[in-house]
Amino acid sequence: MLQDPEIEAVSIVLPDNMHREAVELAVAAKKHILLEKPLAKELEDGKAMYELVKDYDKVFTTGFLLRFDPRFAMIKERLDRGELGDIIHCYVRRNSPIIGPRRYIGASDLSMHVMIHDIDYVNWWMGCQPVKVFARNRSVLLKENGMNDVIYAIVTYENGAIACMEACWTLPENSPTIIDDKVELVATKGVAYVDSCDNGVRFVTGNGVQYPDSRHWYYVNGEVCGDLAEEVMAFVNNVANNTKSVITPKQSYDALRVVDAIERSIREGKEVEL
């Protein structure tokens, strides 16, 4: 497939530990690349991939779909315009039912599969480098699978701002919402909030209460809509117009660096530097 000159672009959705080889092959074949997050499973592979694609003359992007969520983009715009002032601290959470990790057993863990979304957009908002991480975990319901139930991480940035990140994927299977995520960002001139628990629509039936997804991937008239569709269309537009992605290789690598620091902090039981 990579040798076919009519194929200009590839989407890589392989398991995390296979990303490096797939990207290396795609780069050698001079293809535009949409890579599902994370950049890689191991930091060493992520660094090698970053070095490979940082000056790549084709489109390379990583699938952080929250970059295409208008709510998170609005916060970034107001930060860039100075309306909120300088970030003092923020709290973000991303919790979901246990059906998720039961599908992913052995393929990915909580920090890599879930928290990395929040890490990416918080890094993006901060506009500076993360420098220190302290993290704690607990495993109860997923202990026999060798996976974390919950992780809390405190990330300190170069500008002194602090981000507290919470991720849990062991909510009950019958939870009314697929993702319960929240943001509170406190800055010197204002505060920003995001609350995605109810998604703006609710159904009540004999089976209980449901808050279906109306943000990330859903259908309108049979067509996929939401952040995921916007992510794919942004990639297509980059390829068609010969422009760079808003998600840079460095940003993808930095998100992986924070994940690695979270796991190191958990293992060592102390704050670690990046």
What are these regions (language model features)?
Residues 59, 66-145, 154, 162, ...:
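Predominantly a Rossmann-like dinucleotide-binding segment in NAD(P)-dependent oxidoreductases
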Residues 35, 60-62, 91, 194:
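Hydrophobic residues in well-ordered beta-strands that form the structural core
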Residues 22, 49, 75, 261-262:
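Aromatic/hydrophobic pocket-lining residues that form π-stacking "cages" and hydrophobic walls in ligand
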Residues 1-52:
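Beta-loop-alpha module in the N-terminal Rossmann-like domain of NAD(P)-dependent dehydrogenases
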Residues 29-31, 56-59, 161-162:
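A short helix->loop->beta-strand "cap" motif at the edges of active sites that frequently abuts
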Residues 9-14, 158, 234-274:
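C-terminal helix-rich "cap/oligomerization" subdomain common to oxidoreductases
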